[in-house]
């Protein structure tokens, strides 16, 4: 299945994507997934707003009847985004990620190992030190697989380093982004492989670089 991250900006597409992921994870058809999880059916539910502009708190859309293990994974991911990542508590990233974790980045690259992932995450805070995740409007889990849609905010307030050693001057403009993290967890409840999706073009437009 191919997921176009640009479609996450529209509420109907977001719900449909959540429904499709639930169907795949549970080995069901879309119709069966909609019947089992009516809150994910875009034809039966109120569409979510534009996640790149919404200012209100969204009641999370998630499957019902989760077992204790599935709830634990979602709780761990909430702590990861809201506290560890947003607070730059890098020494705690090992609470949710395996030492040899592979992370697939939005630009098509990937990193191997926990420390490499931490260094990649730190770059965001060099030019937007107030970056934080504020909501998880969609949370899906099935067994050892999770898919979570998040809303993040920040401000382009510091120079953005470039590979050639130069830097882009800050514009002082704020941004709000929607992103999706798909993760595969191991038997120790640690992420062993992670896929990150976000609309980079939308962020560039908001901070004045596109």
Describe the predicted segments one by one.
Residues 20, 113, 203:
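Short glycine-/acidic-enriched loop or helix-start segments at secondary-structure transitions
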Residues 74-75, 90-151, 155-158:
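A solvent-exposed, acidic/Ser-Thr-rich amphipathic alpha-helical stretch
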Residues 76, 80, 120, 179-181:
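Alpha-helical packing segments of well-folded alpha/beta enzyme cores
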Residues 4, 13-24, 30, 34-95, ...:
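Short, low-complexity N-terminal intrinsically disordered segments enriched in polar/charged residues
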Residues 37-69, 125-210:
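A beta-strand edge to alpha-helix "cap/lid" segment located at domain peripheries
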């Amino acid at each position: 299945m191919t997921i176009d991250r640009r479609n996450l900006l529209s509420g109907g597409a977001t719900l449909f994507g959540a429904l499709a992921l639930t169907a795949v994870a549970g080995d069901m058809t879309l119709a069966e997934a909609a019947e089992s999880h009516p809150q994910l059916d875009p034809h039966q539910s109120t569409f979510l707003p534009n996640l790149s502009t919404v200012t209100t708190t969204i009641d999370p859309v998630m499957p019902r009847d989760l077992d204790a293990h599935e709830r634990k994974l979602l709780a761990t991911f909430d702590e990861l985004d809201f506290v560890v990542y947003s607070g730059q508590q890098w020494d705690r990233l090992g609470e949710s990620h395996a030492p040899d974790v592979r992370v697939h980045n939005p630009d098509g690259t990937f990193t191997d190992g926990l420390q490499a992932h931490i260094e990649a995450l730190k770059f965001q805070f060099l030019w937007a030190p107030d970056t934080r995740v504020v909501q998880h409007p969609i949370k899906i889990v099935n067994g050892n697989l999770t898919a979570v849609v998040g809303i993040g905010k920040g401000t382009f307030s510091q120079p953005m380093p470039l590979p050639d050693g130069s830097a882009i001057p800050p514009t002082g403009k704020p941004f709000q982004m929607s992103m999706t993290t798909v993760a595969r967890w191991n038997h120790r409840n640690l992420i062993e492989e992670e896929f990150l999706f976000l609309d980079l073009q939308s962020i560039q437009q908001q901070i004045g670089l596109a």
